[in-house]
Regions:
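Elongated, amphipathic alpha-helical interaction scaffolds
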Residues: 1-266
């Protein structure tokens, strides 16, 4: 039996379907952002944006969660949340591309090109895989466009990475508890929380895990990802075998040619 169909399996927030559905609840997203930004975010000040961006030649970027947040009735922030479970060789470039693409989309919609004023673009990645960073002990890294003196070019473009493996280093107790929901969990031994937000998040995740339709959707999505990963692995192995065979063949040809040349010289 596939473990995803086992009723004892608890889907945590690393699973794409559960991550998306959790943060598509404006109360849960508002609570999370309020803690992370240390400022009040109201659920009613959050609207959700299109998660697709069409590229040239008809290709698309599919984002996990995209929301527009209004702070203090004046500041507009476009938030893109992504869960990254698998190591990606070009993860840095991928994050930058996602964020810049969303920034570009907003620029295209701007009405006054003489004095462009768009909301800030903020990309937040939850990273549960290996990630190259100068300080791997951080729980959070912040990236901005700066010059060699550290002067910020624009405050409307930012990329942050949360390193889940270092969640215990987070000084915000509410988030430190919440991040435990982004790790492998035992349904019969779920962590107990002392903070209000983590308790509410746990309760919602329990309800989501009792949703049979959501479990089926998550299972289908995970099977697709596994099949895709298996195809990539097979392609790499076949490419490696082909490369080795070709290398051996070329080596034999070269060896014969060199041996023949040496024989003629002698």
């Amino acid at each position: 039996m596939n473990k995803e169909f086992d009723e004892d399996v608890f889907y945590d927030l690393r699973y794409d379907v559960y991550f998306k559905n959790f943060f598509l609840n404006n109360k849960m997203l508002a609570g999370f952002l309020s803690l992370l930004w240390n400022t009040k975010v109201n659920p009613e000040d959050i609207t959700y944006d299109n998660t697709e961006s069409v590229l040239p030649l008809g290709k698309k970027i599919i984002y996990d969660v995209v929301a527009n947040v209004t702070l203090h009735k004046k500041e507009e922030i476009n938030v893109n949340l992504e869960m990254q479970n698998l190591y990606h060789k070009y993860l840095n470039e991928r994050m930058a591309f996602y964020a810049m693409r969303k920034y570009s989309d907003k620029l295209k919609r701007a009405n006054e090109f003489g004095n462009i004023c768009i909301e800030s673009i903020w990309f937040l990645g939850f990273n549960d895989s290996k990630f190259h960073d100068n300080n791997t002990e951080k729980w959070l890294s912040e990236y901005k466009l700066t010059n060699e003196d550290g002067n910020v070019l624009t405050d409307k473009f930012r990329i942050d990475q949360i390193f889940l493996k270092n969640k215990d280093k987070c000084p915000i107790i509410e988030l430190q508890e919440f991040f435990k929901l982004c790790t492998s969990l035992d349904k019969h031994n779920l962590p107990e929380f002392s903070t209000e937000y983590a308790k509410e998040a746990k309760e919602m995740l329990l309800k989501m895990n009792n949703d049979k339709a959501l479990r089926a959707e998550s299972f289908s999505h995970e099977m697709f990802l596994r099949d895709q990963k298996a195809q990539f692995k097979t392609a790499r192995e076949e490419g490696l075998e082909e490369g080795i065979a070709k290398g051996l063949e070329e080596g034999l040809v070269k060896g014969k040619a060199e041996g023949k040349a040496e024989g003629i010289q002698e």
